[in-house]
Amino acid sequence: LVNQHLCGSHLVEALYLVCGERGFFYTPKAGIVEQCCNSICSLYQLETYCN
């Protein structure tokens, strides 16, 4: 799960794993797709989308 392309349902699943009970907010304008699907993101970057 470290430093890889995450798109669609894979991205959502990764957010559930990283954020756990905190949950997360998904706003396309935040650039998570550009950051994690079009390029590669880290667990630390994913965690910035947690609540």
UniProtKB/Swiss-Prot annotation:
Compartments (UniProt record): Secreted
Disulfide-bonded cysteines: 7-37, 19-50, 36-41
Main localization category: secreted
Cross-referenced InterPro entries: Insulin (IPR004825), Insulin-like (IPR016179), Insulin-like_sf (IPR036438), Insulin_CS (IPR022353), Insulin_family (IPR022352)
GO CC annotation: extracellular space
CDD domains registered for this protein in UniProt: IlGF_insulin_like
UniProt GO MF annotations: hormone activity
Gene3D superfamilies: Insulin-like
GO biological process: cellular response to oxygen-containing compound; glucose homeostasis; glucose metabolic process; positive regulation of protein secretion
Alphabetical list of Pfam families matching this protein: Insulin
Subunit organization: Heterodimer of a B chain and an A chain linked by two disulfide bonds.
Family from the record: Belongs to the insulin family.
Job of this protein: Insulin decreases blood glucose concentration. It increases cell permeability to monosaccharides, amino acids and fatty acids. It accelerates glycolysis, the pentose phosphate cycle, and glycogen synthesis in liver.
Protein name from the UniProt record: Insulin
Organism: Didelphis virginiana (North American opossum)
The organism's taxonomic lineage, starting at the top: Eukaryota, Metazoa, Chordata, Craniata, Vertebrata
Gene giving rise to this polypeptide: INS
